[in-house]
């Protein structure tokens, strides 16, 4: 195990950025989101949750898939280049690390999404344990340990800096790259104390009593026609804020854009909460807010576990708890349906 001081952290980040793209929490106008490192970036490793998750690193909000050009009556198709160089994602919280596993189930199942797969192959994830969990956190509900982040490299906040531990071969290679800024040290006691403090705080969170009894594999018939869906969905605005801030939502649309010199076919995030989501000539899209609202939460808590060995499509990050203008989030749904211990 190694230690990196707060004073040396900027040098370490600069060293990484010199060798590869570096994606990390950056503050801009008081708002912290993941962005690319630059020399004048206001790096923020203290804010617990970025407004948006680091999902963009592997599943961008918008990306070109291929382009079509026509010259002299000849049409050419040029696929977008796949990621072929290593890059690092720094300061990822344990819930967001688990979210990558959820996305893997979607994009790496056969036939694998080549764009996502290339990014996953070359991406190096450096996680950071949650020194001070917030009231909106409920990751423990889904079996996530905020004190034990799973990634290529795991970090914990300790006195005067951070403990650093490589967990995978990719993590070890990154460690070798920045070894000049690390001090090898036995931090077992300090890290264990930090883990215990984090777990104690998590147990005190307002949503630590959530129970998933009645959800999960095989619960479709039990939950689908529950009259509470109507009561809950009546307050939903269908704004889609929850889906765009969620680290596990994977819905997207594919569109064509005429540049005047050719056509780009691109993929962009979409929301199952929108009335025109998956709209087709046959009219198969869900026509009511009740249907759309139910679909979102049934997918996360029933359908996804049904098809993915019991894995839920929620990681308890709490972003929807904080962002929904109606305070109508997955915690409220679970509780209203009886999900408390």
Please give the residue ranges for each predicted region:
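Iron-sulfur-associated redox domains of electron-transfer enzymes in respiratory
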Residues: 1-219
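General structural feature for long, well-ordered alpha-helical segments within catalytic domains
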Residues: 8-12, 242, 268, 329
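Alpha-helix boundary/capping residues
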Residues: 16, 104, 236, 337-340
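Short alpha-helical basic/polar micro-motif
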Residues: 93, 240, 244, 322
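Active-site-flanking alpha-helical
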Residues: 100, 247-251, 325
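Ferredoxin-type iron-sulfur electron-transfer modules in oxidoreductases and energy-metabolism complexes
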Residues: 211-234, 252-341
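Basic (Lys/Arg-enriched) interaction patch that binds polyanionic ligands
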Residues: 233-253
